[in-house]
UniProtKB/Swiss-Prot annotation:
One of its GO terms (biological process) is unsaturated fatty acid biosynthetic process. Its EC number is 4.2.1.59, 5.3.3.14. Its main location: cytoplasm. Belongs to the thioester dehydratase family. FabA subfamily. This is 3-hydroxydecanoyl-[acyl-carrier-protein] dehydratase. It is found in: Cytoplasm. The keyword Lipid metabolism applies. The lineage of its organism: Bacteria, Pseudomonadati, Pseudomonadota, Gammaproteobacteria, Alteromonadales. It catalyses: a (3R)-hydroxyacyl-[ACP] = a (2E)-enoyl-[ACP] + H2O; (3R)-hydroxydecanoyl-[ACP] = (2E)-decenoyl-[ACP] + H2O; (2E)-decenoyl-[ACP] = (3Z)-decenoyl-[ACP]. Pathway: Lipid metabolism; fatty acid biosynthesis. Pfam families: FabA. The active site is at 70.
Length: 171
């Protein structure tokens, strides 16, 4: 496997099926729960902390599944889906680094919402700054992230934590 510095939607879906970064690597969700259309850039030496960064995007279409049910006559993207996308990207970073096992969100320090994603928006941009990765018996990534809608920052999250486990039966 050769690590690329950007990924298409098709490649992200392949990751969800264990076909991109290895069968035993952490996987992204697929179908409606994949909240990312492309990874614009990924590296292990950039970002605020010099330990890696990811910039990814989601194209907004008024026909996206959540606008029809959240809420009736008041459609808005659920904030938890943007937060989940951030966790998805931390897990993807660990897979990209070569982690083996199943990724699980472990927590977040602080989350702030200062805006909303509405059906008329065009694009969501996720920006993650990797703070730390641990590759011992425990594999874990910690990152700070923001979500922008059409260039305006509306979510921020600190200390997003994702672990990678070889056995999740007791988790």
């Amino acid at each position: 496997m050769t690590k690329a510095n950007s990924y298409t939607k098709e490649e992200l879906i392949a990751c969800g099926h264990g076909e991109l970064l290895g069968k035993n690597s952490p996987r992204l969700p697929v179908d409606n729960m994949l909240m990312i259309d492309r990874v614009v850039t990924i590296n292990d030496n950039g970002g605020t902390f010099g330990k890696g960064e990811i910039v990814a995007e989601l194209d907004i279409d008024p026909d996206l599944w959540f606008f029809g049910c959240h809420f009736v006559e008041d459609p808005v993207m659920p904030g938890c889906l943007g937060l989940d996308a951030m966790w998805q990207l931390v897990g993807f970073f660990l897979a990209w680094e070569g982690a083996q096992g199943k990724g699980r969100a472990l927590g977040v320090g602080e989350v702030k919402f200062t805006g909303q994603v509405l059906p008329g928006a065009k694009k969501v941009t996720y920006k993650l700054n990797i703070k730390r990765t641990i590759h011992r018996k425990l594999v874990m990534g910690i990152a700070d992230a923001t979500l922008e809608v059409d260039g305006r920052e509306i979510y921020s999250a600190t200390d997003l934590k994702v672990g990678v486990f070889t056995d999740t039966s007791t988790f």
